[in-house]
């Protein structure tokens, strides 16, 4: 039998556009964002019993470049991000904590279609390359030394959501602007909802890890692999509060 895991996550993000211009029939937008999030993964043993839980609290800073073809709506999103992690693994009243740093680069594209005046469907394709370095740590059972890990992912899916006074044809990092720079009441804010189911294929995952106890000769080194296919479901709400500021909340489930 093979151990199984399932997890969930949620985060909030604040982003702002720095430059918006038109180039050769395309709309170009660049900007920066900050995010804070929490994820939790439950691990089951071979017999289906609970083996432990891994939690991660993270804060991120990143930048984005968005290109939209004016006539067709086809878009491409390029994102670069750095993240600080605070992780905790719990099992049988034993806790292990570690801090670390991560990075991520992403290229995403999509093409929106109108179903109704206020409902859009958008097929999407995304490539992601990410890396993570964690500090060494120990718990009651022994020590763990982490190396640098990295992995690549390809995501295929679609986004279904409302279209309320906000351009839908963009990726996860940028949004079009409104004519009015400020809304004066909550009821006036353009708020959109969306759901995004996807299939994710992970490949070229690398990373060495060693662990052991104080006993001589107990050290073991192995290279866990994350290669495989997973299902992902995300949902969120977004509101434009100023001409170049979007507030959003997002949650997801992966298996």
Give a label for each model feature.
Residues 2-255:
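Membrane translocator/pore-forming domains, dominated by Gram-negative outer-membrane beta-barrels
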């Amino acid at each position: 039998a093979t151990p199984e895991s399932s997890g969930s996550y949620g985060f909030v993000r604040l982003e702002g556009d720095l430059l918006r211009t038109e180039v050769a029939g395309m709309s170009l937008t660049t900007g920066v964002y900050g995010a804070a999030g929490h994820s939790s993964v439950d691990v089951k043993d071979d017999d289906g019993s609970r083996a432990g839980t891994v939690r991660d609290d993270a804060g991120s800073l990143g930048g984005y470049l968005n290109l939209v073809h004016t006539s067709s709506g086809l878009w491409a999103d390029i994102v670069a991000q750095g993240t600080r992690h605070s992780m905790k693994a719990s099992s049988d009243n034993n806790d292990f904590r570690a801090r670390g740093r991560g990075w991520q680069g992403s290229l995403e594209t999509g093409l929106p279609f109108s179903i109704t005046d206020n409902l859009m469907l958008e097929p999407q394709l995304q490539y992601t390359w990410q890396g993570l370095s964690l500090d060494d740590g120990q718990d009651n059972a022994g020590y763990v030394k982490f190396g640098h890990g990295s992995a690549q992912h390809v995501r295929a899916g679609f986004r279904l959501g409302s279209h309320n006074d906000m351009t839908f044809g963009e990726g996860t990092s940028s949004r079009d602007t409104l004519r009015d720079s400020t809304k004066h009441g909550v009821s006036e804010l353009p708020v959109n909802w969306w759901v995004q189911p996807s299939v994710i294929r992970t490949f070229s995952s690398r990373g060495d890890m060693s662990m052991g106890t104080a006993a001589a000769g107990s050290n073991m080194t192995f290279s866990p692999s994350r290669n495989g296919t997973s299902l992902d479901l995300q949902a969120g709400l977004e509101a434009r509060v100023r001409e170049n500021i979007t507030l959003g909340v997002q949650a997801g489930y992966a298996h």
